[in-house]
Design a protein with these regions (language model features):
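Compact beta-sheet-dominated domain cores in extracellular/mature segments
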Residues: 1-173
Length: 173
């Protein structure tokens, strides 16, 4: 893939993608490499922007699939718009923006130790920028793309649980 452009399988037959694509299955069966020539993308191992999510920025990922613990299925990809001004996200301890609220404007490598003192984020509201939620502290584990808008429950961002250990702004590197 080539994203923004993204090339999937840049060592052989490839597919160039320059925007969101909800179903890449018809383009190829397997993906062994990815090259992002410009922009940033989130790739998914299921169609319709579902399943495991993987963040891609400019660069070549010749053996990314094995290193990231990802199978060789890339079934959808979403372009992440560049954002360079302020970042703002509100995190809530309950569904539907209920309970204690915490606002972030910068990265947080350990949500429990540094700021929120809870392990679970059940809902959030992004007013500025794009963010990545990570399942564990220090930007490890499953990741989830959080775009501007309201998320009334963790399942709306693709979360399997409300567990969020760290949060990072997606900046144009």
């Amino acid at each position: 893939i080539i994203i923004g452009s993204i090339y999937i399988n840049f060592g052989g037959r490839y597919y160039e993608c320059m925007s969101d694509c909800a179903d890449l299955h018809s383009m190829f069966q397997r993906c062994r490499s990815i090259r992002v020539e410009s922009g940033m993308f989130m790739i998914y191992d299921r169609p319709g922007y579902t399943g495991n999510q993987y963040f891609m920025k400019r660069g070549g990922y010749a053996d990314y699939m094995g290193k990231a613990g990802m199978n060789n299925c890339v079934r959808s990809c979403r372009m992440i718009p560049s954002h360079s001004s302020t970042f703002r996200i509100r995190l809530y301890e309950h569904f539907d923006m209920g309970g204690e609220m915490m606002e972030l404007t910068s990265d947080c490598p350990n949500l429990v130790m540094e700021r929120f003192n809870v392990h679970d984020i059940f809902s959030c509201n992004v007013t500025d920028g794009n963010w990545l939620f990570y399942e564990h502290p220090n930007y490890r584990g499953r990741m989830y793309l959080i775009r501007p808008g309201e998320y009334k429950r963790f399942s709306e961002w693709g979360g399997r649980s409300a567990r969020v250990g760290s949060i990072r702004r997606i900046m144009d590197y």
